[in-house]
């Protein structure tokens, strides 16, 4: 059952867990799907992009909304034929797929009007939008313009927009890029759609231990188990991005089953990945970030993989009583970020096993799995400005590897602000 899934606000893990069901096939392109599954709430700023994604799914097709506690938003008005489901997701999707293929359920019509992507009729010397050998918008599609190359040549440069639902990127991330072949010669990052207050995380997202720790005491064991699971979930997604989907599923199962003190399976996983030369070839030396560029950003594992012992837990007496010390790497590349998260997952499980009844003291900030989290923002907000300079000059494959290794979460800042606002209202 081919499904293209869009994880809305606060639903990242629930959508990820669908991969564990043998009846589900989450595909990487809408052209291979029959069902568009939308989980949670979608920012209004992404409604048009979601409609374009819907219209690129071939017939027969159906949109399914899985609310997961989220209220209906304005975006649903563009999907009048959608089906809402609450539970038994694989079974319901299987039934909808069967109805589509048998003709019992009609295919959904397009949402957007059938208009040209850009004016082209009667434009140019031949009336088809082109302006010569290069340039223009023939039949509404842009052609490559000549531009400078890193080797001093002038080659074709093609504009390309990637996101906001590209499966390898975090939901909401949009890159406006220019490519010469597969080389990124120019990159711009659009504004984070999750910080415009058009959507807030749903109730399930608001109950996460790191968000709660901003305003209330939380068990260290709960926090460290959640940290280890978050790192393993990242490993599972990163393996899928490296075309190692079967191994990624094994890691995802481990992430859902791991318990405090269970560090041996993670150590074994780290050894297996160390032997997997495919990962070494694709990550070693890729996306290197110097420590100076990360100083003071609270970038968590990304900073520690570049040699900065930057970790709020080192200032917490409860952690110091457990003998906690930050783990660091030296290389600062994608491979180091892989090693960093695996090492921290092992460390967190050991800490969770020894934490007993120790609890945090709320200070308004917390070391999340991705770095310093506070109501003013999460680590993704501080890393996004680095992306253009980091990616420009890279081959596309290395750029994807680099972005995956950063483990960006664009929703985190919005969710943290919403949690703090909710606590203020309640008081």
Regions found by a protein language model. Name each.
Residues 1-118, 345:
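Iron-sulfur-associated redox domains of electron-transfer enzymes in respiratory
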């Amino acid at each position: 059952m081919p499904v293209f899934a869009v994880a809305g606000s606060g639903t990242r893990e629930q959508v990820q867990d669908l991969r564990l069901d043998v009846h589900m096939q989450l595909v990487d392109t809408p052209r291979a799907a029959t069902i568009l599954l939308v989980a949670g709430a979608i920012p209004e700023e992404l409604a048009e992009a979601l409609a374009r994604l819907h219209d690129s799914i071939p017939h027969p097709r159906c949109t399914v909304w899985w609310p997961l506690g989220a209220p209906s938003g304005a975006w649903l008005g563009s999907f009048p034929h959608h089906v809402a489901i609450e539970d038994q997701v694989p079974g319901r999707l299987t039934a909808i797929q069967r109805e589509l293929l048998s003709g019992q359920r009609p295919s959904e019509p397009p949402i957007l009007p059938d208009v040209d992507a850009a004016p082209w009729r009667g434009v140019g010397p031949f009336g088809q939008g082109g302006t010569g050998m290069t340039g223009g918008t023939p039949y509404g599609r842009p052609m490559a313009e000549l531009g400078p190359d890193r080797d001093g040549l002038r080659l074709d440069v093609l504009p390309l927009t990637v996101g906001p639902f590209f499966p390898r990127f975090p939901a909401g991330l949009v890159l406006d890029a220019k490519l010469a072949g597969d080389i990124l010669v120019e990159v711009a990052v659009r504004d984070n759609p999750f910080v415009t207050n058009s959507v807030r995380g749903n109730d399930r997202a608001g109950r996460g231990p790191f968000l709660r720790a901003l305003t209330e005491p939380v068990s260290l064991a709960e926090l460290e188990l959640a940290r280890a699971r978050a790192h393993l979930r990242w490993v599972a997604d990163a393996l899928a991005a490296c075309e190692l989907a079967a191994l990624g599923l094994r890691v995802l199962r481990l992430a859902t089953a791991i318990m405090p003190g269970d560090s041996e399976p993670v150590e074994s996983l780290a050894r297996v990945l160390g032997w997997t030369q495919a990962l070494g070839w694709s990550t070693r030396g890729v996306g290197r970030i110097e420590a100076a560029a990360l100083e003071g950003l609270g970038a968590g594992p990304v900073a520690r993989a570049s040699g900065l012992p930057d970790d709020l837990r080192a200032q917490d007496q409860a952690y110091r009583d457990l003998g906690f010390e930050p783990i660091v790497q030296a290389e600062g590349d994608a491979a180091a970020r892989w090693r960093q998260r695996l090492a921290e997952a092992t460390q967190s499980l050991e800490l969770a096993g020894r934490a007993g009844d120790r609890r945090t003291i709320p200070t308004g900030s917390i070391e999340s799995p991705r770095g310093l989290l506070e109501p003013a923002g999460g680590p993704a907000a501080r890393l996004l400005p680095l992306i253009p300079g980091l990616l420009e000059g890279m081959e596309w494959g290395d750029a994807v590897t680099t972005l995956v290794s950063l483990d960006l979460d664009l929703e985190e800042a919005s969710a943290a602000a919403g949690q703090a606002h909710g606590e203020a209202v309640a008081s």
